[in-house]
Structures are given as structure tokens and as C-alpha cells.
Amino acid sequence: MSSHSSDSSTPDRGRLPHHREVSFRSPNPSTPAGEQILRRLREELVLWLTTVDATGAPHSLPAAFLWDEAHSTFLISSTAEEDRDRLIQIQQNPKVGLHFNLDLSGADSFILTGEAKVSLDDPSFDQIPAWVAKYQAFFSQVGLTIKQAAVVSPVALRVRPVTMIARF
């Protein structure tokens, strides 16, 4: 008998949770996975935004975000000066990755691919009630008012998710 065989009574602790890639649809809150994804979209403060430079090398940076359920898009704050390279990369290639933090087991993780663009239509972040509600306590802990944070990161990126890879 192979040491890799398992029966249904023994958990397989050596394997990562099953993952699958699917076209993105707004998560269904009536399913356990959909409920968990929506909770993370609403509550997590940071995701990792991955862009690709002209040579094809990926670059991942943490970013504050707001899930816009009405439009099924992400609103991501970006600084104009420090993120200049990222903004150029998005103009050259709008395909991006959005990675959410995971635990050491790799369970409860999901990665999205999408298309990003600089948004000129969104108001300043301090004028968006959902943004203020989500980030006010965080910024106050680091010594910034929500208005100061909006001045530091004035560029709005909109990301439309295309695919999702999830492990649940």
C-alpha cells in the first residue's frame, strides 16, 4: 500500500486546500464561501496589488482598498509620487493581480486578476463615506486624519475583477 493513499477517515494534512480558477462574479452571500469572501472584501484593510513592468517582471505593493459592491469594482488609493512606476505600469498594461492575505496553511485564500485604470471620476477619499468608515480608526492609529491620508494618497484606481482563484 502506498504511503500516499488515504481514506475518508484520515485528514490529508500534507496537501493544500483545493483551489480553482473561475470567471469573477460578485460573491453570493448565501453560500459559506461567498459570505466569507464578502466579509473579507468589506473588512480587510490591505490587499497586495501586483502590476507588471515593461520587461514582464511583477511588482507587488500593499494598497488600501474599498470594495464597491454596486459596481463590482475595487477602489484603490495610490500616492502620485511614490507609486509613479505603478501608475505607468497600469497605463502600459492594465492587467493586475489582487492578492489577499492568507494564513500559513493557505486556506481561505483568494487571488483576483483584473483590469485597472486611473479614475478621474471618483471624489477625494475623505469624501467617500464608506472609505471614511473603513479607514478612520486605522489612520488615526498611525497619526493621520482621514483628510491627511486623502492628501497623501490622492490617486484613485478602479479595478474590475476578471477571474478569481480561491481556496476554501
Could you describe each region identified by the protein language model?
Residues 19-48:
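Short, basic/aromatic recognition patches
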